Design a protein with these regions (language model features):
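Helical substrate-recognition/capping region of FAD-dependent monooxygenase/halogenase enzymes
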Residues: 1-3, 7, 23, 77-79, ...
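Core Rossmann-like FAD-binding/catalytic domain of the broad FAD-dependent monooxygenase superfamily
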Residues: 1-352, 356-359
């Protein structure tokens, strides 16, 4: 029997598959599209996602294909400098097309032994106390112990489970695509600058060789958003907002998106779970979607692996919903607020100017930047040291870097005292004796996702906390 079927071969599904494979879980990824998409949905990784790649030893691959940008200016496109001394070793945004991100994650998943089947569409599922039966469009039936729906905003898995998806429908829509432009670059730049003085959802960004990424408000909301717009729709809307269509032609791909925000009522139903856009949708303001999905996978992977491998403590798998559902709710509010600030209406523009003024205060700028980059997230792991529940930033050690010790996806005790022991949890938790000038606590216990589960120097206190996240001791 397959351990876990992942429905959906996008970044969330591929990241989840890799996390599961690090723990020896037999994973099958089912992707309904026969070949990788050329549609560039997202354009970059925020700080926390960059840290995630570094924690798994993947960052150099991504840096080789991306470009670093300042983190400032991502909240509603308000142009402000990056805050000073952001609490990370990676204070930048990595510009990288999602098509490249997908390819790198697929390569990683395959290297780890993941089977990826393309052209396989899940159309039905049934579960019992022992597993899940998945039915494919060609009539094939597959049996697995668990199944995770990473199949996007129109998730078949979510619909088959009957999980509610409440929220706000789209009120406005935006056209997005890549196409050739015949107008001179200087003309494009001048017209775009003028239009964007009042219409923030308008832009033409050069990609090279005469190709531009074009974004322009649509006329109304389409009855069926799964139907791609036409090049003529782009021309019409460009003329409406800019007085010219810039001579657009030869589209690579065309799409549309709205400002809908929806959040699944629950992330788990028995042996089936949801992650990524299958669990939450929102407008793309602030570049949150792909990053939110990657971090869902990073949170879920080790917990589901623990369940499959038989050492998960009670409630560990349910903590995926407990921890990630509020994060998504916060992101929905964040993206909705930013989208409102893009409106050309006088009211939202007045608020935008006020927010811009407030961001001149360092604390306000830092607060919003930390929310955009997701480094402010703190899970409820109990009371105690201020580090508890927070993700641990990378720090320099005497013998290397902290994140170099987390590539295997296990728990980690970083012990600056040399007096502690992980005892009967050594098969699940690595023990590193090393010191860092950047760390002012004797020792920290990190979960496989890099969040701090314990901090201190008392051996008995450590042993009392290990079972909550790593199950019963062995031996």
């Amino acid at each position: 029997m397959i351990d876990v079927i992942v429905a959906g071969g996008g970044p969330t599904g591929l990241m989840l598959a890799s996390e599961l494979r690090l723990h020896g879980v037999h994973v099958l990824v089912l992707e309904k599209e026969a070949s990788p998409t050329t549609y560039v949905r997202a354009l970059g990784l925020h700080v926390r996602s960059i840290e995630v790649m570094d924690q798994r030893g993947l960052l150099e691959r991504f840096l080789a294909h991306g470009r670093r940008y300042p983190v400032g200016g991502f909240f509603a496109g308000i142009d402000k400098p990056s805050p000073d001394r952001l609490d990370t070793a990676h204070p930048y945004v990595l510009g990288i097309p999602q098509t490249t991100t997908d390819r790198l994650l697929a390569e990683r998943a395959t290297e780890l032994g993941t089977e990826i089947r393309r052209g396989c569409e899940l159309v039905g599922l049934d579960q019992d106390d022992h597993g899940v039966t998945a039915e494919l469009a060609d009539g094939t039936r597959l049996r697995s112990r668990y199944l995770v729906g990473c199949d996007g905003g129109r998730s078949t898995v979510r619909k088959l489970l009957g999980i509610g998806f409440p929220g706000q429908p789209s009120r406005v829509e935006t056209l997005l695509g890549e196409m050739r432009v015949t107008a001179p670059p200087e003309t494009v730049a001048a017209v775009v600058a003028e239009v964007r003085r009042t219409h923030k959802r308008f832009g033409l960004g050069p990609l090279g060789d005469g190709v531009y990424r074009v974004v322009v408000p649509a006329e109304g909301v389409a009855e069926d958003r799964s139907v791609a717009p036409t090049i003529e729709e782009f021309r019409q809307q460009l003329r409406l907002f800019a007085g010219t269509d810039f001579g657009v032609h030869s589209p690579r791909w065309l799409s549309r998106f709205g400002d809908a925000t929806r959040l699944a009522e629950r992330y788990r139903s028995g042996r089936v779970l949801l992650a990524g856009d299958a669990a939450h949708i929102h407008p793309p303001t602030g570049g949150q979607g792909l990053n939110l999905g990657l971090q869902d996978a990073f949170n879920l992977g080790w917990k589901l692996a623990a369940e499959v491998n038989g050492w998960a403590p009670e409630g560990l798998l349910d903590s995926y919903h407990t921890e990630r559902h509020p994060v998504a709710a916060d992101v929905l509010d964040l993206t909705r607020a930013q989208f409102e600030l893009l409106s050309p209406e006088p009211g939202p523009q007045s608020v935008r100017r006020l927010v811009s003024d407030l961001m001149d205060f360092e604390d306000v700028n830092r607060y919003l930047t930390e929310k955009i980059t997701a480094i402010q997230i703190r899970y409820d792991v109990g009371e105690g040291h201020d580090l508890l529940g927070r993700r641990m930033r990378d720090v320099e050690l005497e013998r290397g870097r902290l994140y170099e010790l987390t590539h295997g996806g296990r728990g980690l005790l970083l012990d600056q005292t040399g007096r502690l022991s992980v005892g009967g949890w050594a098969d699940r938790v690595d023990h590193a004796v090393d010191v860092s000038e950047e760390l002012d606590v004797p020792a920290v216990l990190l979960r496989p996702d890099g969040h701090v589960a314990w901090a201190g120097d008392d051996q008995q206190d450590l042993l009392a906390h290990l079972p909550r996240w790593f199950g019963a001791a062995v031996g």
